């Protein structure tokens, strides 16, 4: 399968830390609702745009994620231009690694069998007038 590309509209969101609840004498971990909702959005957009394409379990994969954050409304026109020209980068949350993690986890069993297949990955955070996340996945070699 060739490279696949898809876009998730809206502001980028990073993987939230698991929460714990007490059930009897035990602590039970659970995924925060906002994280679960965003993972479902990723899955839906992948299925809709990539038509259920799935890489084989032996494929070594690369993933490139570009997260476009909105320019804050209080930003001057001069500073906005610098942000759009990629001279100022988003230094705020979500962290780049949490963005990558939520996409890898959401696409487990959807685009690929397991996120351990990702051997080459990169996340870039930029500013844009239209917030979104663009994702590319490709085969980088054959295992076995």
Predicted regions and their residues:
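Acidic, proline/glycine-enriched N-terminal capping motif
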Residues: 1-144
